[in-house]
């Protein structure tokens, strides 16, 4: 746009009404490389036609998808108006991960960026809209990307839902910008964009929103709709619009986005917005019943246009220009032009010689369909705002179907001026479904100038210096923005003040911020260029918003010594606020001291101490006034010495005049002692300085006057004493520097002034409580709220300045930004030392500097405050005009495009097999001169000929049933196969070419990897024969089977018998979804009822009805299970005959399997439900798969027991110097102390964690040892369990909060033996220990359980990074999981864990997911009487009819239909009376005595250790501990046949957030030991996650967390197979989990898995050799320093980039929060895995939560490496 005369207004013009809407911002992205409004306007004026060919990548998947597409796509219109790089998007700017960006419709991406640009064009800080009621209405109509992604069903992912939905476009904008107003997608076909504008207007008028973002977007990705429009004749083959032209034959489709920002005109004027145009009115209608739904309707268009004019209160004859829809269709254009003529032309009485101008933007940028209306509106706005009638592109000969001679309309051929005073335009839009929209706009109101105002060139006052801000979401972007600004600022004529204003409050303020302070344009450009080069300058600021930013800044008013000759002179002349503050105290100072502060500052008269004191105060209150006038406000204040007076004034305790009175009277008294004192700054801590004074006998003559920092202080006293002390310190090489003063401030020298000062100021001040936080440096308690009365100012004069205390208090209160308000920084260094000592990342910076330009310094300080994130009202300092011409955001685009799996097009092999028919028959070729037929196809993941998964050793293979089905389909005449040999499975590990060859009845399947083509192209060496056989057409006798009699003959077995068996031998999944619903027999004969499509009805089978593969797959799979007694994975190897009855494939069938006596040959008959045979497989032989574990081996891989091998001892032990015991005094404590004292280790005993507050836990070599001691009464178990956990948590929290180097050790005795209730109470500590070790390894030493009275010195000193240790016979041992050896199988046991029909079984947590699954399994296993105990219970049975949605009721009904009797008892056994209440409930049931108990009750409330509360912890602990003890009371040991506890392996592996849950489960494990010691038949199952069930049910996050720990979940069936397997072994704790494999020489993520994690067999290859070579040459990790930091930053950034799928580590901003870059909770688990692998350091699960950026992680790893 050449110029933008739109303006902000004072008073509204009388012709504008309250319903007028201001258009204040616009942006677009259109074909022809149009990226801005200016480029769009230039394209219109130059009549540019942006049409062209569609980019090749758009339709490429459709060429691959189906060979038939190629021919049709060649006939489809491929020309149109396309964006250059539709796939490009700046994902990182919006904090969107590459993975999510790839799954987002490009329309969402474009709309997001263009919306941002529109808001910037409007001069709105986008980030300021967060939380507002801003509305978003976006027109959208294309679902091309959605179809592309969702039709690739195997590739569908969760994010594709919102990522490709229409609603996702406005909703994504609202979500990203945190907008809370209406957010709606508008689909009105081609009218969508203008309808969205209408809805935005309505939302503003209704008061729903104060701002509306409206527009439309369109993307042309797939050919489908273009093909539709081709068929309908709507688009022209040339892909070019020719609106109003006689040659028009249809439209050219266009893509892009256009967005406008709307606000009520009255509010836009108040807000100082620059109005581009006024939306006077709009209307939307529908053409109703017409000749056809897609036929345009002239009458409807006229009606809607007149309604819009009526709403706008505009005379149609005052409208000089109409932007028509004008798609260039033969029917649409004449109809629309006639409607326009009726409303605006001759029909309205317009003279022919003054025609209404019309035009259409479509020949320039195409028909954007959903974005067409908003694009037309932008063109119209540009026309009225620039006062130009825009010329029509592609217009030569007027359309002869239009009555140009009489309609009083004229198409604009060339650029012409718009001379009317009041420029108005109409905009038309309609959709092919009948929606009609119309809008009326008017030029922006002109500004109202007063009579004295200059009209013409605006004269700006000199606002130098200038503060220019810019910011970015990531630090790397700052350079690009600086470069862009430098170039533009150097060329533009816009006033620098306007540019500064725009950047300050009309641009978004991101986390990474820069600022420069410049006196003029040349300096600004130079500084910006330095910023673009990442160089530094004294007047440049580069910061990231601090964590302390929101808290605000602490203003620190320093004391004596900051003065310099010309201080304040510049400010008196240029800052009214400064002059006002100083002048307000001038008379007071004159009266008391007989001099004028104003004159003294003007003349630089600061020679005497009294003037220095008063002028220090004057400068500070003046600077405070200036800072506040420029929008800064203190959040807290600190005063240093005399600076406390100005601090108290700033805090509201004193008036400025009271402060002046105090400082003047004090200064007058200082004249009495001037010349008698001196002060020196020394490099000694205040404590060391006191010792030094004592050594030299100077304590009476010299005082520690100022506690400057932890390592420095100021000494004050008489001149001789200071001289002597100074020399003595220098002799000791202790730095001492003179303070420029002749008064011994804050020393006994001033005692003589106390009474005179009190007398002088008494009654003259009325101190108030501070209005903001005020830290004292005169009181020992910095937060003291003492009134700043007369006594306070006496203390302030004499007592030491406790600056360090005040700064520490502020840091403890989470302040971190300090601004020294003084004429020169004199205490910044000291404050910085305190900040560093506190291990804070706080900052301190000055307001002014000696001999530097004062206004420039103040602006620099404001810039520092803002860049650190301190709240500032920027409008207070930047109050002038602004310009929308400041460049918008620089996008860093990367391509994001989902490559869908639509197959790969091969030369001459474009026809692939029919996936739904489950065959591999592709393109058919007849070999000339022979009877050989060949079919060729390509097999890969996208052409998988079966719907499920069929892995073998982790490699997906094609099921044998598909191969058999393929052979049967090689000819319609075939109904049988003979002599089938299945040699090698067809693997799907890589794309391969398949050939099916049929020759003289013999068929074979051969393949070759595509990767091998070209290498052996002329040989047969790379072709592999998989399966051979003969096809036949034989008559065969079909037998029948009496189904009912066979069922009675064979024993009933659970339906999952075959699939359970297959899973146990390593086949967890089936290639087809068949399901066994009934199963009989498990010996030499079996009968199975199979549903091949259990989720489908007879009429909706999800595959071709001609496919025999699903039922053949069930037959071959079930057939192999007949050998279950000798479990090993078997695959079909040979088949004598397969026979079928063509056309009679049943959905539900019976499979009758028999084995030939004495042979390994299986015969399978496939029968319909009447028992008639429809197919058979005879003579099927199997081959065992080498290396596949058998059934027992497979279950053994799930069930493990705990072992305790000796721990590895470190060569250099921990230097133990001090042990702080937390324990009651006891014989054990006494023995430990005596043992340690012999080894020269000091000891302290505190009775509880609170006692640690008084202990020094920061000294080297110190540990905290917690010794639990409880009661041997069983009834006290729950109480002490809670107490022990609570105390350990308190200690851990204290150490974490203090950042103490001391580690916590928990020392128990006899816990693992579990012979006493006391050891039982300690059981939860085992689980708690592992969670603390996981979340806070920095404070955890270990839990050590001992078997004697000796202190476990070996464990504490020499065992490193082990969370739990067992010391037995003085040997430290560590926990490891081991497989349960077969030698432990126990036979002939008297007791069992298997339920029977005679028993009564009780399940706690019985209505929970695991409880119900246990109930189902027990009934399946024979149980017929169950009692389900639950806290919530169920409604009375009479109400069950209304509770169909309750899964518990549904399950119970099913179990009762199976013959079981189910009783539900509502009882909370975690309560103190839980046992009694449960006993009463059982008595009422009057059932036989309980035979077995399953304790599955539990509650989960995840909380991190540092955040957990005792209430929450106990809620989780109680069901496990109190619940188990209640059952223990009801069912003493040896009174049950079995007792089963449901625990969790999470406490072994340290799952974060599960401190309470792990503690409860660890108790159950100890409880199992405790009862086992008493002869009970009990087992505790430490479960991993069950897929989709329980409190740790598998979710994406849980699965990722499990994998990070080195394990995975188990299925429900696997869990109960593990139960059955575990009961064969005499183990009391069965750990059930599946360990993930690691490399042959690799290390599992957790040491406890070391002995059970499978090892991958290393492959010897050239690639491996190269890899090893690369590893061996890898540079060593630097030891420390900058090299280590750089190494870690690169390594961690690479891990982050890998997790987020970023192009490279360079795209990772080390200071940006990972969540802002798009990382979610699942990704954090993956990142931990990458970090552990890369850096060989164990990473706590909570690390990334507490270390949110790469820089934070670098700091953590620096300490670890």
UniProtKB/Swiss-Prot annotation:
Residues 918-1191 form the PKS/mFAS DH domain. Residues 1686-1761 form the Carrier domain. Residues 918-1187 are annotated as: Dehydratase (DH) domain. Its EC number is 2.3.1.165. Gene3D superfamilies: 3.30.70.3290, 3.40.47.10, ACP-like, Malonyl-Coenzyme A Acyl Carrier Protein, domain 2, NAD(P)-binding Rossmann-like Domain, Polyketide synthase dehydratase. The modification O-(pantetheine 4'-phosphoryl)serine is found at residue 1721. It catalyses: 3 malonyl-CoA + acetyl-CoA + NADPH + 3 H(+) = 6-methylsalicylate + 3 CO2 + NADP(+) + 4 CoA + H2O. It holds the Pfam family KR. GO terms for biological process: fatty acid biosynthetic process; secondary metabolite biosynthetic process; terpenoid biosynthetic process. InterPro entries: Ac_transferase_dom_sf, ACP-like_sf, Acyl_transferase_dom, Acyl_Trfase/lysoPLipase, Ketoacyl_synth_AS, Ketoacyl_synth_C, Ketoacyl_synth_N, Malonyl_transacylase_ACP-bd. The active site is at residues 190, 325, 367, 641, 950, 1113. Residues 1050-1191 are annotated as: C-terminal hotdog fold. It comes from the Eukaryota. This is 6-methylsalicylic acid synthase AOL_s00215g283. It comes from Arthrobotrys oligospora (strain ATCC 24927 / CBS 115.81 / DSM 1491).
């Amino acid at each position: 746009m050449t110029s933008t005369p739109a303006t902000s207004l004072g008073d509204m013009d009388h012709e504008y009404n309250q319903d007028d809407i201001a258009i204040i911002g616009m942006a677009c992205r259109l074909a022809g490389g149009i990226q801005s409004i200016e480029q769009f306007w230039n394209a219109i004026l130059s009549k540019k036609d942006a049409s062209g060919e569609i980019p090749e990548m758009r339709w490429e998947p459709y060429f691959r998808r189906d060979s038939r597409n190629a021919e049709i796509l060649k006939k489809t219109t491929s020309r149109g108006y396309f964006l250059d790089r539709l796939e490009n998007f700046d994902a990182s700017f919006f904090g969107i991960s590459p993975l999510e960006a790839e799954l987002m419709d490009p329309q969402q991406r474009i709309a997001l960026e263009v919306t941002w640009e529109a808001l910037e064009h409007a001069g709105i800080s986008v980030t300021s809209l967060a939380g507002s009621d801003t509305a978003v209405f976006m027109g959208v109509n294309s679902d091309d990307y959605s179809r592309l992604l969702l039709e690739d069903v195997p590739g569908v992912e969760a994010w594709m839902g919102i990522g490709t939905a229409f609603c996702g476009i406005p909703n994504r904008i609202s979500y990203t910008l945190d907008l809370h107003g209406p957010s709606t997608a508008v689909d009105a076909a081609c009218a969508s964009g203008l309808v969205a504008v209408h809805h935005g207007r309505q939302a503003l008028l209704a008061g729903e929103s104060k701002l509306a973002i409206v527009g439309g977007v369109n993307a042309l990705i797939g050919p489908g709709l273009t093909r539709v429009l081709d068929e309908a004749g709507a688009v022209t083959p040339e892909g070019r619009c020719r609106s109003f032209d006689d040659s028009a034959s249809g439209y050219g489709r266009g893509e892009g986005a256009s967005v406008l920002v709307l606000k009520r005109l009255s509010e836009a004027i108040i807000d100082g917005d620059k109005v581009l145009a006024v939306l006077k009115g709009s209307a939307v209608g529908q053409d109703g019943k017409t000749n056809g739904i897609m036929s345009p309707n002239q009458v409807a268009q006229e009606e809607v246009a007149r309604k819009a004019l009526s709403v706008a209160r505009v005379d149609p004859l005052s409208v000089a220009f109409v932007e028509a829809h004008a798609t260039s269709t033969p029917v649409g254009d004449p109809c629309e032009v006639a409607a326009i003529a009726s409303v605006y032309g001759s029909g309205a009485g317009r003279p022919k010689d003054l025609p209404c101008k019309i035009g259409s933007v479509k020949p320039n940028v195409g028909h954007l369909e959903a974005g067409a209306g908003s694009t037309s509106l932008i063109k119209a706005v540009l026309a009225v705002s620039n006062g130009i009638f825009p010329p029509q592109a592609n217009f030569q000969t007027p359309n002869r179907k239009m009555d140009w001679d009489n309609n009083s309309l004229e198409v604009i051929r060339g650029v012409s001026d718009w001379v009317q005073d009041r420029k108005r335009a109409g905009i038309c839009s309609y959709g092919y479904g009948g929606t009609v929209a119309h809008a009326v706009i008017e030029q922006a109101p002109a500004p109202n100038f007063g009579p004295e105002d200059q009209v013409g060139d605006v004269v700006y006052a000199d606002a130098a210096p200038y503060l220019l801000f810019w910011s970015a979401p990531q630090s790397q972007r700052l350079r690009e923005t600086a470069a862009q600004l430098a170039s533009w600022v150097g060329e533009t004529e816009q006033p620098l003040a306007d540019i500064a204003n725009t950047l300050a409050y009309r641009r978004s303020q991101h986390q990474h911020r820069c600022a420069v302070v410049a006196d003029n344009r040349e300096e600004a450009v130079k500084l910006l260029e330095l910023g673009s080069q990442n160089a530094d300058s004294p007047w440049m600021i580069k910061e990231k918003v601090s964590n302390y930013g929101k808290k605000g800044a602490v203003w620190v008013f320093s004391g004596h010594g900051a003065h310099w000759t010309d201080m304040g002179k510049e400010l008196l002349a240029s800052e009214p606020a400064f002059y006002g503050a100083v002048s307000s105290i001038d008379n007071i100072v004159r009266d008391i001291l007989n001099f004028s502060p104003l004159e003294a500052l003007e003349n630089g008269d600061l020679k005497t101490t009294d003037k220095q004191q008063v002028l220090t105060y004057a400068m500070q209150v003046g600077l405070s006034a200036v800072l506040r006038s420029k929008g800064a406000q203190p959040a807290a204040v600190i005063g240093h010495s005399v600076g406390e007076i100005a601090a108290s004034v700033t805090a509201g305790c004193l008036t400025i005049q009271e402060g002046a009175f105090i400082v003047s009277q004090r200064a007058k008294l200082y004249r009495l002692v001037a010349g008698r004192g001196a002060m020196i700054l020394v490099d000694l801590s205040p404590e060391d300085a006191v010792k030094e004074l004592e050594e030299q006998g100077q304590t009476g003559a010299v005082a520690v006057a100022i506690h400057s920092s932890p390592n420095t202080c100021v000494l004050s006293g008489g001149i001789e004493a200071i001289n002597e002390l100074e020399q003595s310190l220098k002799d000791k090489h202790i730095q001492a520097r003179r303070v420029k003063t002749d008064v011994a401030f804050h020393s006994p020298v001033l005692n003589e002034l106390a009474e005179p000062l009190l007398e002088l100021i008494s009654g003259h001040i009325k101190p108030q409580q501070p209005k903001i936080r005020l830290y004292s440096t005169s009181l020992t308690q910095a937060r003291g709220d003492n009134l700043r009365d007369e006594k306070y100012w006496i203390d302030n004069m004499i007592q030491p300045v406790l600056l360090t205390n005040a700064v520490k208090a502020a840091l403890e209160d989470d302040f971190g930004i300090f601004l020294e308000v003084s004429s020169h920084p004199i205490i910044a260094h000291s404050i910085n030392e305190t900040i560093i000592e506190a291990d804070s990342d706080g900052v301190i910076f000055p307001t002014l500097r000696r001999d530097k330009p004062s206004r420039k310094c103040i602006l620099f300080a404001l810039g520092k405050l803002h860049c650190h994130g301190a709240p500032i009202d920027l409008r207070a300092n930047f109050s002038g005009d602004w310009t929308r011409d400041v460049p918008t955001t620089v996008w860093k685009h990367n391509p994001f495009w989902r490559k869908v799996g639509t197959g790969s097009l091969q030369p001459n092999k474009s026809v692939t097999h029919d996936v739904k028919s489950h065959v591999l028959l592709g393109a058919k070729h007849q070999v000339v001169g022979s009877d050989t037929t060949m079919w060729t196809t390509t097999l890969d993941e996208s052409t998988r000929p079966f719907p499920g998964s069929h892995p073998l050793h982790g490699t997906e293979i094609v099921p044998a049933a598909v191969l058999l089905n393929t052979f049967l389909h090689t000819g319609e005449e075939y109904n049988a196969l003979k002599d089938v040999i299945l040699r090698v499975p067809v693997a799907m590990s890589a794309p391969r070419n398949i050939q099916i060859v049929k020759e003289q009845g013999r068929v074979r399947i051969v393949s070759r990897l595509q990767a091998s083509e070209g290498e052996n192209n002329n040989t047969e060496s790379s072709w592999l024969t998989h399966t051979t056989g003969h096809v036949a057409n034989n008559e065969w006798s079909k037998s029948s089977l009496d189904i009912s009699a066979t069922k009675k003959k064979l024993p009933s077995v659970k339906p999952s018998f075959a699939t359970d068996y297959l899973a146990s031998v390593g086949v967890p999944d089936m290639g087809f979804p068949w399901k066994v619903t009934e199963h009989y027999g498990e010996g030499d004969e079996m009968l199975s009822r199979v549903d091949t499509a259990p989720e489908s009805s007879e009429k909706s089978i999800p595959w071709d009805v001609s496919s025999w593969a699903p039922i053949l797959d069930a037959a071959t799979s079930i057939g192999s299970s007949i050998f279950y007694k000798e479990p090993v994975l078997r695959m079909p190897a040979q088949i004598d005959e397969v026979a079928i009855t063509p056309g009679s494939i049943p959905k539900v069938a019976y499979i009758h399997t028999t084995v030939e006596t004495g042979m390994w040959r299986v015969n399978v008959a496939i029968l319909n439900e009447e028992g008639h045979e429809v197919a058979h497989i005879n003579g099927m032989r199997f081959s065992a798969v080498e290396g596949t574990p058998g059934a027992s081996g497979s279950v053994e891989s799930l069930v493990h027991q705990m072992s305790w091998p000796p721990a590895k001892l470190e060569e250099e032990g921990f230097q133990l110097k001090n042990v702080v015991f937390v324990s009651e005094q006891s014989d054990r404590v006494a023995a430990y102390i005596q043992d340690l004292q012999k080894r020269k280790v000091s000891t302290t005993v505190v009775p509880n964690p609170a006692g640690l507050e008084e202990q020094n836990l920061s000294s080297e070599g110190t540990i905290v040892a917690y010794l639990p001691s409880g009661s041997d009464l069983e009834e006290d178990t729950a109480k002490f369990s809670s107490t022990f956990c609570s105390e350990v948590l308190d200690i851990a929290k204290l150490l974490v909060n203090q950042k103490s180097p001391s580690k916590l050790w928990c020392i128990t005795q006899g816990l693992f033996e579990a012979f006493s209730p006391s050891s039982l109470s300690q059981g939860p500590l085992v689980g708690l220990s592992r969670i603390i070790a996981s979340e806070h390894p920095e404070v955890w030493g270990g839990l050590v359980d001992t078997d004697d009275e000796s202190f476990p010195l070996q464990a504490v000193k020499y065992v490193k990074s082990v969370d739990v240790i067992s010391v037995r016979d003085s040997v430290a041992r560590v926990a490891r999981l081991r497989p349960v050896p077969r030698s432990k199988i126990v036979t002939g046991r008297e007791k069992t864990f298997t339920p029977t029909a005679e028993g009564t079984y009780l399940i706690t947590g019985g209505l929970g997911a695991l409880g119900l699954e246990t109930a189902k399994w027990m009934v399946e296993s024979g149980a017929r009487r169950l009692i389900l105990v639950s806290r919530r219970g169920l409604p009375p049975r009479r109400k069950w009819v209304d509770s169909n949605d309750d899964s518990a009721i549904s399950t119970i009904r099913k179990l009762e239909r199976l013959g079981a009797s189910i009783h539900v008892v509502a009882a909370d056994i975690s309560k103190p009376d839980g046992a009694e209440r449960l006993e009463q409930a059982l008595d009422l049931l009057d059932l036989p005595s309980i035979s077995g108990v399953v304790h599955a009750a539990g509650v989960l409330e995840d909380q991190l250790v540092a955040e957990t509360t005792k209430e929450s912890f106990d809620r989780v602990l109680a069901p496990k501990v109190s619940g188990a003890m209640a059952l223990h009371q009801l069912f003493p040991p040896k009174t049950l046949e079995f007792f089963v506890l449901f625990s969790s392996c999470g406490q072994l592996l340290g799952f974060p957030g599960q401190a309470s849950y792990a503690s409860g489960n660890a108790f159950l494990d100890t409880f199992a030991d405790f009862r086992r010691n008493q002869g009970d038949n009990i087992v505790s199952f430490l479960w991993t996650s069950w897929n989709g069930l329980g409190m740790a049910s598998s979710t994406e996050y849980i699965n990722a967390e499990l994998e990070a720990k080195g394990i995975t979940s188990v299925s429900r069936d696997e869990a109960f197979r593990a139960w059955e397997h575990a009961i064969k072994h005499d183990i009391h704790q069965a750990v059930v989990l599946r360990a993930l494999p690691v490399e042959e020489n690799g290390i599992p993520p957790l040491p406890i898995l070391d002995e059970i994690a499978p090892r991958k067999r290393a492959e010897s290859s050239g690639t491996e050799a190269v890899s090893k070579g690369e590893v061996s040459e890898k540079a060593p990790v630097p030891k420390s320093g900058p090299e280590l930091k750089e190494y870690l930053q690169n390594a961690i950034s690479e891990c982050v980039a890998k997790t987020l799928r970023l192009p490279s580590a360079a795209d990772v901003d080390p200071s940006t929060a990972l969540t802002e870059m798009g990382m979610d909770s699942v990704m954090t688990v993956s990142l931990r895995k990458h970090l552990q692998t890369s850096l060989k350091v164990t990473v706590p699960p909570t690390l990334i939560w507490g270390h949110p950026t790469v820089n934070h992680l670098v700091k953590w790893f620096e300490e670890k490496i």
